[in-house]
Amino acid sequence: MLSRLAFAALLLTAVAAGALASPARIGGVPIYLPAPHGFCDLSESNPSDKRMVTTLTGLLEKSGNKLLGMSADCQQLTDWRTGKRQLLDDYAQYQTPIGSMDKPPSETVAQTCATLRQEGNKILENQLPDIKARVESTLTKIKMNETSFLGVLAEDANACYAGLIQKIHTEAGTDKTQITAFAVTIIKNKSVFGYRFSVYRNQQTIGVVLGKLKADVSALLVANGRGPQAQAPARQSENPSNSLSSSTRK
């Protein structure tokens, strides 16, 4: 499920932002992608949104992943569109590995988690069991515009959760530290990667972001028939008719 090319795409995702709408189709299978609570989809009708999507889609495809969908904090998105803010800090994405779109995953969630742990062990010589301590230790080592893998953050029967941290000098001329938590799960026998991005503020940030990502995965499962309230969800969007159509997806 997680080839070296796909792992490289996970790292690449930490440095970019983009978007689409649902349901997506992976190898002809419809997958509903609910936006997180308080998040809105980017719109194809907005030129800034479209440029961002186009750029990110191309970057990810070169690394072996397909962008399925993305949303951002609704207020941040509104302010960004109107020029009140230059950057989006809180946003989410769904992706899938291109190589397995037309076939079942080659690994179970547990096997993928084992692969991610191995990658983490290569990068983190002495992986600290406490997540907060791991983040703080990594922060002292990474330099500006570097990304570091934080290893596996959690695992359950439905998903494997891992993280990245990056120090960025932004195009707005500011510096920020970004936390990325991602989940690897299987929906309708298709691999789906879910991402949460946020600014690192203190030791509590990683726990907060991980908790929100777990909620996103739960909503994803329910939306695709794996929960007591399973249904096709309504997306949060300022104008649903303007969101990117499923015809843009494979």
Model regions: which residues?
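Short N-terminal segments immediately surrounding and downstream of signal-peptide cleavage
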Residues: 21-38
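Short N-terminal edge-element motif at the start of the domain
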Residues: 22-23, 48-49, 53, 57
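Bacterial N-terminal signal peptides that target proteins for export
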Residues: 1-9
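N-terminal signal peptide c-region/cleavage motif recognized by signal peptidases
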Residues: 14-16
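Short, surface-exposed beta-strand/loop micro-motifs that present aromatic residues
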Residues: 176-187
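Primarily extracytoplasmic ectodomains and periplasmic/lumenal surface modules that are beta-strand-rich
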Residues: 37-51
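Conserved polar/disulfide-associated segments of primarily extracytoplasmic proteins
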Residues: 54-172
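Surface-exposed amphipathic alpha-helical segments
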Residues: 190-250
